[in-house]
C-alpha cells in the first residue's frame, strides 16, 4: 500500500474528543485533523510526537486530513489509522503474501454473520472447502517492561472485540474456518500477547477461542511514511488464563 499523494508531517499538539487532533506544521500553522483510532493510543499520542497525515479530495468531508503515522521517541513508525489494518490485510491476501490465507477463489468484505448482528471483516470462499471468516485487529501498543519488543492487544477494554471472538467461535462450531488476524502496525513490536492487564475478559475469551479451534495469526507489515508492504509473521504468546474446569 503506497500513500498517494504523499503524506505531510507536523508535530502533535493534542488529541481530544477521541476523533480530533491538533497538529502544528513546520511553518507554524496549526490544523485540526481526523483521528480514526478510538483506542487509548498509549505511546502513540504524546504531545510533541512527529505525525504524518493524508489529505482527502472529498469535498463532503468536514476535516480533509487524516492522521496516519506517528513516530515514537525510539524512532519506530506506528500506523494509527485503524482503517488501514483491513486495507493492508486485504491487499496482502490478494497478493498471496499471507501463506495461511491463500488458496481461495473469492474474497468479500463486511458480510453479515454470526448470532450478534455482526459483519465479518474478510470472508474467503472457494468451492469444496469451508468458508474462512477473518476478523482483523490493529495492534499498536508496545510495552517493553517485561520483554523487549512485546506488543499487546487491546490497548483499552473492548466489548466489540469480545463480541467478535464469540462470533468466530460460533463460525468454527458450525464447521467453518475462523481466524483472528492481528495486523501489527508498530515497527518496534516483534512478538505479542493478549493484554490481560488491560482487559482480562478479552484475554480469557482468546484462550477459549484457541481451545475452540479459532486460529490466531499475527502479521507485521513494514510500516513507513511512504508505504506499508509485506514483511513477516511474528509469534503470538498465549496467556494461559483459563480457570481450571473452563471449557
Curated annotation (Swiss-Prot):
Molecular function terms in GO for this entry? DNA binding
Q: Which InterPro entries match?
A: SfsA, SfsA_C, SfsA_N
Organism superkingdom: Bacteria
Q: By its UniProt entry, which Gene3D superfamilies does this protein fall under?
A: 2.40.50.580, 3.40.1350.60
Coiled coil, from the record: none
Entries under PANTHER family matching the protein: SUGAR FERMENTATION STIMULATION PROTEIN A (PTHR30545:SF2)
The record's similarity note reads:
Belongs to the SfsA family.
Q: What is this protein called?
A: Sugar fermentation stimulation protein homolog
User: What species does this protein belong to?
Assistant: Aeromonas salmonicida (strain A449)
Amino acid at each position: 500500500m503506497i500513500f498517494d499523494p504523499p503524506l505531510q508531517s507536523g508535530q502533535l499538539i493534542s488529541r481530544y474528543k477521541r476523533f480530533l487532533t491538533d497538529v502544528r506544521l513546520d511553518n507554524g500553522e496549526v490544523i485540526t485533523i481526523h483521528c480514526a483510532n478510538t483506542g487509548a493510543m498509549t505511546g502513540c499520542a504524546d504531545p510533541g510526537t512527529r505525525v504524518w497525515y493524508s489529505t482527502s479530495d472529498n469535498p463532503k468531508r468536514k476535516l480533509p486530513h487524516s492522521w496516519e503515522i506517528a513516530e515514537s521517541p525510539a524512532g519506530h513508525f506506528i500506523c494509527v489509522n485503524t482503517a488501514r489494518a483491513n486495507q493492508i490485510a486485504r491487499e496482502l491476501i490478494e497478493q498471496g503474501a499471507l501463506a495461511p490465507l491463500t488458496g481461495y477463489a473469492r474474497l468479500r468484505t463486511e458480510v453479515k454473520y454470526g448470532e450478534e448482528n455482526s459483519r465479518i471483516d474478510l470472508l474467503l470462499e472457494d468451492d469444496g472447502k469451508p468458508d474462512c471468516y477473518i476478523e482483523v485487529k490493529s495492534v499498536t501498543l508496545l510495552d517493553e517492561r517485561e520483554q523487549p519488543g512485546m506488543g499487546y492487544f487491546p490497548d483499552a477494554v473492548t466489548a466489540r472485540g469480545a463480541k467478535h471472538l464469540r462470533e468466530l467461535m460460533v463460525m468454527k462450531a458450525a464447521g467453518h474456518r475462523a481466524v483472528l488476524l492481528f495486523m501489527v502496525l508498530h515497527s518496534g513490536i516483534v512478538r505479542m500477547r493478549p493484554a490481560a492487564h488491560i482487559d482480562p475478559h478479552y484475554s480469557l475469551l482468546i484462550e477459549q477461542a484457541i481451545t475452540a479451534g479459532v486460529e490466531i495469526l499475527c502479521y507485521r507489515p513494514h510500516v513507513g511514511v511512504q508505504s506499508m508492504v509485506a514483511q513477516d509473521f511474528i509469534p503470538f504468546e498465549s496467556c494461559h488464563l483459563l480457570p481450571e474446569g473452563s471449557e
